[in-house]
């Protein structure tokens, strides 16, 4: 029986995808946490901004808090959206493997000739026994199209 397990492990190592969906990936989210804008003002939902997050396995249950920041041209920096830009804390997983999740926000579209520049600010926590065992803070960035459902942006620009 042990030789069967060794042969299955050898086949899985030599032939990518040999076990199809039977074997979960080592980390569905990758080795490092990431966040990306995966929805940006689509025609079917004007003003919608979606943030997708990938969170690796870790020491405890996985929690995320996604917030939206807008670019304030007057100050030359991003600031938290005052209303409607906090998704609250969401539990994503047990910590045993990498997970993905996210939140979609809805904002009023700007007046003609104006624009909103938005990005996600994400706090990730791994929790065990009522305490935080690890914390990370990241902002959205591009480069995760395959993980984020086809769209991966650092920011969302909504202009009219």
What name fits each language-model region?
Residues 3-33:
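C-terminal region of N-terminal signal peptides and the immediate post-cleavage residues
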Residues 128-160:
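Short beta-strand elements
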Residues 62-84, 117-125:
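Short beta-strand segments and strand-loop junctions that repeat across beta-rich extracellular domains
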Residues 79-98:
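Solvent-exposed serine/threonine-rich low-complexity stretches and specific carbohydrate-binding patches
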Residues 41-54, 61:
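Contiguous beta-strand segments within globular domains
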Residues 111-116, 122-133:
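Extended, solvent-exposed regions of the mature portions of secreted/cell-surface glycoproteins
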Residues 98-114:
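Signal that preferentially marks extracellular ectodomain short beta-strand elements
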Residues 32-42:
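Non-catalytic, glycine-rich low-complexity segments
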